[in-house]
A protein has these predicted regions:
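Extracellular acidic, Ser/Thr/Pro-rich low-complexity tracts
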Residues: 103-105, 143-145, 196
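Composition- and surface-driven signal marking solvent-exposed, interaction-prone regions
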Residues: 83-87, 152-155, 166-168, 199-202
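Hydrophobic alpha-helical and helix-loop surface patches within well-folded domains
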Residues: 1-140
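Compositionally biased, low-hydrophobicity segments enriched in charged and small polar residues
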Residues: 79-91, 167, 173-177, 192-195
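Short acidic/polar inter-strand loop motif in beta-rich domains
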Residues: 160, 190-201
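Beta-strand-rich binding/interaction modules
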Residues: 109-110, 130-190
Length: 202
């Protein structure tokens, strides 16, 4: 994604000084945020430096934003995020980052800007119910606080992902009918790209 150090991207002043390659975007950073969240120390990513605790300023918030950007990149696909970051950089931040993304994609982005980076409460998706027959598996998915967001359903066989499918959760309990196939089970965001409050029910 390139260096972001000179831009107040997403309206987050303290993002200056961090770069996407340095952050790394792997599951360890989601773990760092989740550790702070479980300790009830998490804060909104849009707060100014002076309002953040030192641990949130230095570790939790930057890694949370990094994980979120990577998750957003996976959701949008087609290099949309990378192209949008380059355009944002070339405009010296004059055009809102959200507007640039919306011009390149028709997908819902409110979940990211209104909830992910602005709300201190972590998402909490979980599989509420499963019903199987000979040809299909129906799963009901819920989000604890009724929030809307995209999620990736992973089809897993022998502990490896054999298929991935993106869905957009409406905020209400939703049932998805899946064809039975060559997989052992399904899981929500099994690669930990999206920080969550509780992963044991995914």
């Amino acid at each position: 994604l390139g260096a972001l150090k000179d831009f107040k991207i997403l309206g987050i002043p303290f993002f200056k000084g961090y770069s996407a390659p340095k952050i790394g975007f792997n599951e360890s950073f989601s773990f760092i945020y989740e550790f702070g969240e479980h300790a009830n120390n998490q804060q909104s990513d849009t707060l100014g430096r002076e309002k953040l605790t030192k641990s949130n300023e230095l570790y939790t918030s930057p890694y949370h934003v990094g994980s979120g950007l990577f998750y957003l990149d996976q959701y949008l696909g087609k290099n949309i995020l990378e192209e949008s970051l380059r355009e944002f950089a070339s405009s010296n931040g004059k055009e809102p980052f959200k507007s640039i993304l919306e011009n390149k994609s028709n997908k819902n982005l409110n979940w990211f800007f209104n909830d992910y980076i602005s709300d201190r409460e972590a998402f909490d998706l979980h599989i509420k119910n499963t019903l199987k027959n000979k040809t299909t598996t129906s799963i009901t998915i819920s989000e604890k606080n009724g929030r809307k967001l995209p999620f990736k359903l992973d089809f897993i066989k022998n502990d490896s992902i054999v298929k991935e499918q993106w869905y957009f959760h409406s905020g209400k309990d939703s049932t998805y009918k899946l064809k039975r196939g060559k997989y052992d089970y399904v899981a929500i965001n099994s690669n930990r790209y999206l920080p969550e409050k509780n992963r044991h029910n995914n």
